[in-house]
Design a protein with these regions (language model features):
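Cleavable N-terminal signal peptides of Sec/SRP-targeted secreted and luminal proteins
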Residues: 3-22
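Alpha-helix boundary/capping detector
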Residues: 149, 219, 245-249
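Extended amphipathic ligand-handling, pore-lining, and cofactor/metal-binding catalytic surfaces
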Residues: 171-224
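C-terminal helix/juxtamembrane-tail motif
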Residues: 20, 25, 232-250
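A positional/structural detector of protein chain ends, strongest at the extreme C-terminus
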Residues: 1-4, 248-250
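Flexible, active-site-adjacent loop/turn segments at secondary-structure boundaries
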Residues: 98, 187, 205-206, 242-245
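Sec/Tat-exported extracytoplasmic proteins
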Residues: 42-53, 57, 208-212, 216, ...
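Hydrophobic-cavity lipid-handling domains and compact docking modules
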Residues: 23-184
Length: 250
């Protein structure tokens, strides 16, 4: 990937932008392919892009993406417990506060990787749940609120090059998201859950908070896959309109 897919992956990776024009605005930095300290330039460009997530970018027709809205996420865990959770009307806040580091770019293979660190991410949604966790059978629905602290994740974008109307574009093929570490989690299921005729209510929130690392193992695989696919979708929208030479001039 052209090292300076910076602004582009700024528009694809952390950016997650839906672009309505084929030209990048002046406020987005670009890094020439053969420039010295290329990766530092890319890192600075990506960090700048992250700061645009909350307000969006009018010149690109980009709506605000922090908070990030997701219609639905389905958890079907059968590894250690049998637990099904459906999250609806998901609202994710905190991406714009992420710090970007460890950026690497491979020009020959069209790949980009970076590490993002967010001090906190707020996850809010409606939910319904059925199954078993820590020997407790639960069924219920309502609203939930999770606060994840000190989230560190690695993002890896892989693309191929295609020719479109005399321009070379990226066609993203894979966007891998891996949460490397999670410092803390505060988990609140606001409405009562039931075990038979017994109401768990806040007791279930206490149970998952006392065992939050265990509960995170239930959420993590699906969260990584779902958000990785979502980011890939945004990356495809960006790169099918913005030529590589616009984001990484020769």
């Amino acid at each position: 990937m052209p090292p300076t897919a910076a602004s582009a992956v700024a528009a694809a990776s952390l950016l997650l932008l839906a672009v309505d024009t084929a030209n990048l605005p002046a406020e987005f930095s670009v890094c020439k392919r053969n420039a010295a300290n290329m990766e530092k330039c890319v890192q600075a460009a990506l960090q700048d892009v992250a700061s645009h997530l909350s307000a969006g970018t009018l010149s690109l027709g980009v709506v605000p993406l922090d908070p990030l809205q997701v219609p639905q996420i389905n958890i079907h865990h059968v590894v250690k417990y049998i637990l099904n959770i459906r999250f609806r009307n998901v609202r994710l806040t905190g991406l714009a506060n992420a710090d970007v580091s460890n950026v690497t770019a491979d020009v020959k293979t069209d790949k980009l990787s970076l590490v993002g660190e967010a001090p906190h991410i707020l996850f809010e949604s409606d939910y319904d749940m059925l199954g078993k966790f820590i020997e407790v059978f639960v069924v219920g629905s309502g609203k939930c609120k999770f606060v994840f602290g000190n989230v560190t994740a690695q993002l890896r974008l892989e693309s191929e090059r295609v020719q479109r109307e005399c321009h070379v574009h990226w066609r993203p093929q894979r966007f891998a998201l891996e949460v490397l570490s999670l410092g803390s989690a505060q988990l609140n299921f606001g409405d009562p859950l039931m075990i038979g005729a017994l109401s768990l209510g806040s007791n279930f929130s206490q149970l998952v908070n006392d065992n939050w690392r265990e509960f995170w193992t239930v959420l993590k695989p699906t969260f990584q896959e779902r958000f990785g696919l979502l980011f890939l979708e945004f990356a495809v929208k960006v790169f099918q309109k913005v030529p590589l030479d616009d984001v990484c001039p020769r």
